[in-house]
Amino acid sequence: MLSRQFVREHPETVRDAIERKGVTGVDLDEILDIDEEWRELKAEGDGLRQERNEVSSKIGELKQDGKDEEAQEAIDRSQELKDELQDIEERADELESQLEEALLELPNIPHESVPTGEGEADNVERYREGFDDLRDLPDEVVPHYDLGEDLDLLDFERGAKVSGGGYQFVKGEGARLEHALIQFMLDVHREQEYVDVLPPIPVNSDSMEGTGQLPKFAEDAYRVGARQDDDYDSDDLWLLPTAEVPVTNMYRGEILLDDDLPVKHQAFSPNFRREAGEHGTETRGYVRVHQFHKVELVNFVRPENSYDRLESLLDEAAEVLDRLELPYRVLDMCTGDMGFTQAKKYDIEVWAPGDDMEDGPDRGGRWLEVSSVSNFEDFQARRAGLRYRPERHESADYLHTLNGSGLAVPRVLVAIMEYYQNDDGTITVPEPLRPYMGGQEVIEGSEKIGESAVGAGEKE
């Protein structure tokens, strides 16, 4: 959330952010008008309050002097002022409520280093890693969704039967590989001095508002026990779309001490999102689904340290791919593709060679986003009331929040299935994951179960 004072004093900066981020449905002039009327009413109320205090202070003296008629006039005037003041305060409270709601619709201001652009085509590639020494791949890499079904690692048909489209079963060695990835990621980040958190899965509306998911993106989240389009209040529950929500809000409304900072938490969780994208090859399989696992990295830092921390956070997230020797690139996200809440954002995209896409690298395959690494500055902190006290005797100030996936598990799994694929249709287990799989080096798959497998010629 932007402060009222900032919006009031820098309207053109805010207007520019609205335009550059492509935010629609926001009337900044109306917000400024509400703020101006609110300030005028507050000033008028202060004047009436002062006049009433002066009138009231004379009543006792007038009575003592026997000036009963003048005393009654003062009493009547005091009551008139009280009634006027009540009307003004009620209107001011109404405007303040409107203003608070309107401020939630304003996007964060992009950092000066953010490239200007309208969409993903305008993002700037910062660097690539892992392409100088690629492993030998099969002449034709089988896409993960076909290979996963062939080896009985992924079952989309039964997932749809149980829960609907966009859900899946991860089975056998596929499930073991996913568990291995999760534990490996957590261990990597523990080495980076992250403290583990196991968060609650349902989160309330105040928490969703604190990190910026509400009110802007309510349609993308799963709501518990209510219709999606019903009005919500602070007690309503949502299935978390990312562990960023509960972990950031863990300290909501609190004041941290200067020597607490930086705070670095990591949280593994399932994540739930209604929006599953368009149908087709780009979203087929385990790439864009309604439920997926992720390790989230959340940082709370002093404002002056947040951009140095952003670069370190980027390195911490990317280290998972470095150790797995998976090729990837880092993008500096442009204003039109960076998001509503971010001041600056990097995306880490892993290379998956199984499907050739127009926006993929020259050698074929495609890019899969596995992490967005973001600095929110004090945008989330203002919404959630996250402050720190620089010195014990000083006033509290808003801290800065950052987060990034460390990483999104399904897409890393997809990249492993395609990049570590062998000519015989097996998958080599990356060396760092073998200790988590009992030393297993190769995934060969399992025999399928059921009469349908016999009919399909997949089982004798």
UniProtKB/Swiss-Prot annotation:
Belongs to the class-II aminoacyl-tRNA synthetase family. Type-1 seryl-tRNA synthetase subfamily. It catalyses: tRNA(Ser) + L-serine + ATP = L-seryl-tRNA(Ser) + AMP + diphosphate + H(+); tRNA(Sec) + L-serine + ATP = L-seryl-tRNA(Sec) + AMP + diphosphate + H(+). GO terms for biological process: selenocysteine biosynthetic process; seryl-tRNA aminoacylation. InterPro entries: aa-tRNA-synt_IIb, aa-tRNA-synth_II, aa-tRNA-synth_II/BPL/LPL, Ser-tRNA-ligase_type_1, Ser-tRNA-synth_1_N, SerRS_1_N_sf, tRNA-bd_arm. GO terms for molecular function: ATP binding; serine-tRNA ligase activity. Keywords: Aminoacyl-tRNA synthetase, ATP-binding, Cytoplasm, Ligase, Nucleotide-binding, Protein biosynthesis. It comes from Haloarcula marismortui (strain ATCC 43049 / DSM 3752 / JCM 8966 / VKM B-1809) (Halobacterium marismortui). The lineage of its organism: Archaea, Methanobacteriati, Methanobacteriota, Stenosarchaea group, Halobacteria. Its EC number is 6.1.1.11. This is Serine--tRNA ligase. Pfam families: Seryl_tRNA_N, tRNA-synt_2b. Pathway: Aminoacyl-tRNA biosynthesis; selenocysteinyl-tRNA(Sec) biosynthesis; L-seryl-tRNA(Sec) from L-serine and tRNA(Sec): step 1/1. It is found in: Cytoplasm. L-serine binds at residues 242-244, 296, 405. The keyword ATP-binding applies. One of its GO terms (cellular component) is cytoplasm. Homodimer. The tRNA molecule binds across the dimer.
